[in-house]
């Protein structure tokens, strides 16, 4: 892309200030800035200008409960294992985050969760996936989403660890796409004179990022019909779970979600409901007090099934989402940016920029239906989000020990 072409493109979106320092840059810096402009999706700015749509009519949605699953476990497991053996199932690990909140400078997955050994979050997840591959007798294709920040370090770490025994040929990497950061007036921030301030485009961008990386060709070549997407920060996460896959297929659903019963009405977790007759995840802050506290005749919460970011999607339905624009969520954050006089890059003490993100929960609402698959919290939900307190390293370690994992 040449300067004039970049200027014309930026003018279309009212962002020509990004070229303010162009004439002061070296040839290499100019080329890098033009490259960044050429690759950037500026259409998100138009979507960001619109208010998020209000929720429709919300109703409770029942689940395939733990007791119901136990009754049909053998049937579900056989269906799921058959699908895995056919090569119809892939797993997608969302691992773009950093471990900064855990006191770790690298990727969150390399954080050491072990106490007396070197067990990392990545190793926990690879072990859990290998449990499935041993049952099935075949590997499950694993797609790992990294970020610009941690891609090289993630690849190097897993290569050094020899993928914890997982076949390297079954592991595919792709980098999460980035979105520009804007100020209160909708102007894109500069990080330096030659670099636009960007941030990851949210966990809802995982499938479009797979497409961008050319991995939809792999799905087609290998006849992968289902993708199980899950987050890096749950060390008890059971992925490519044959029983979960089998139950979703048996129910003729186009998607499935693992859920846990909420510990209390005030637990800050998204709840899977129906919105205007379609599956939808309602965030904690979107629920009224009445909804949070509503109970059934048996005393259980009416809106009780919380999501744990473990979803199963049919690939043909995911492909349809590529033609639609997921809702854009704006998060007001502290973002390192160039000072007004252009002399230095600083990270402000107060939030100064909107990060533009899509969320995987909005992909659920685009599905015709979704099977809620209840799992035991103590066996499958040990999030590692904080250094101490709730959902922390300590609570995750306690749950790992409870499940017989040596630390």
Which role does the model predict for each range below?
Residues 85, 92, 104-107, 116-123, ...:
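Conserved structured core elements
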Residues 2-3, 234:
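Hydrophobic, well-ordered secondary-structure segments
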Residues 95, 114-117, 146-149, 175-178, ...:
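Short, flexible loop/turn elements at secondary-structure junctions
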């Amino acid at each position: 892309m040449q300067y004039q072409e970049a200027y014309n493109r930026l003018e279309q979106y009212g962002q020509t200030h990004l070229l303010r320092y162009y004439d002061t840059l070296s040839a290499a810096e100019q080329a890098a800035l033009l490259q960044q402009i050429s690759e950037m999706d500026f259409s998100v700015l138009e979507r960001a200008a619109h208010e998020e749509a209000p929720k429709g009519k919300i109703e409770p949605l029942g689940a395939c409960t733990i007791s119901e699953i136990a009754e049909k476990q053998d049937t579900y497991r056989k269906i799921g294992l058959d699908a895995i053996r056919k090569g119809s199932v892939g797993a997608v690990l969302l691992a773009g985050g950093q471990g900064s909140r855990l006191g770790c400078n690298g990727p969150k997955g390399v954080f050491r969760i072990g106490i007396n050994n070197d067990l990392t979050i990545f190793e926990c997840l690879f072990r859990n996936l290998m449990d499935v591959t041993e049952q099935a007798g075949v590997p499950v294709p694993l797609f790992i989403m990294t970020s610009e920040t941690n891609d090289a370090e993630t690849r190097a770490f897993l290569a050094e660890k020899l993928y914890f025994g997982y076949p390297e040929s079954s592991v595919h990497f792709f980098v999460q796409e980035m979105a520009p950061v804007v100020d209160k007036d909708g102007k894109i921030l500069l990080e330096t004179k030659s670099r636009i301030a960007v941030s990851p485009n949210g966990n809802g961008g995982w499938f479009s990022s797979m497409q961008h990386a050319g991995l939809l060709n792999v799905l087609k070549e290998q006849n992968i019909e289902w993708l199980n997407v899950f987050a890096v920060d749950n060390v008890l996460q059971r992925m490519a779970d044959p029983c979960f896959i089998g139950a979703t297929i048996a129910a003729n659903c186009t998607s499935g979600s693992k859920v846990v019963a909420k510990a209390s009405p005030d637990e800050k977790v998204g709840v899977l409901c129906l919105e205007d007759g379609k599956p939808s995840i309602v965030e904690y802050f979107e629920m009224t007090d009445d909804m949070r506290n509503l109970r059934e005749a048996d005393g259980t919460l009416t809106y009780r099934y919380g999501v744990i970011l473990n979803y199963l999607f049919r690939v043909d339905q995911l492909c349809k989402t590529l033609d639609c624009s997921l809702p854009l969520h704006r998060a007001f954050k502290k973002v390192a940016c160039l000072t007004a006089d252009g002399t230095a890059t600083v990270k402000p003490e107060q939030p100064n920029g909107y990060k533009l993100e899509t969320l995987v929960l909005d992909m659920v609402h685009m599905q015709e239906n979704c099977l809620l698959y209840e799992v035991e919290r103590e066996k499958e939900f040990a999030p590692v989000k904080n250094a101490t307190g709730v959902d922390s390293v300590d609570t995750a370690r306690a749950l790992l020990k409870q499940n017989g994992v040596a630390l």
